[in-house]
Design a protein with these regions (language model features):
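Short, surface-exposed beta-strand/loop micro-motifs that present aromatic residues
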Residues: 71-75
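Basic, Lys/Arg-enriched alpha-helical interface segments
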Residues: 1-68, 78-82, 89-112
Length: 112
């Protein structure tokens, strides 16, 4: 998926007011990973999706080729709005995908 142009980046907040993606990002002990993920989000904002793939139920996976194989899960809530759902790495990928799908369904049920 390659798009050029400005994309609005938003972060999913649970019904309990928890920003799941931000909580995960700041908990990373690998500071280089933190920087690389932050840069990918900035690139995403400019329309550069790079290495990503669709999963299911409208959830996508943004892959960061560093360390543990970090992933950022997101959904598109419009043509120009990306909702960051959660993150993880290759080791927790299956669980993270299930969480991301549940978060996106929750978001759509509450917001859309």
């Amino acid at each position: 998926m390659l798009r050029l142009g400005m994309i609005s980046i938003r972060e999913y907040i649970t019904g309990d007011n928890v920003n799941v993606f931000r909580k995960w990002l700041i908990s990373l002990k690998d500071k280089q990973a933190y920087v690389r993920i932050s840069r990918r989000i900035m690139l995403l904002e400019r329309g550069g999706f790079g290495d990503c793939k669709p999963l299911r139920n409208g959830v996508w996976e943004l892959r960061i080729d560093h360390g543990a194989g970090y992933r950022v899960y997101y959904g598109m809530t419009g043509k120009e709005i990306v909702l960051l759902l959660c993150g993880g790495d290759k080791r927790t990928q299956d669980r993270d995908i299930e969480k991301a799908i549940a978060y996106f369904e929750d978001y759509k049920g509450r917001i859309l």
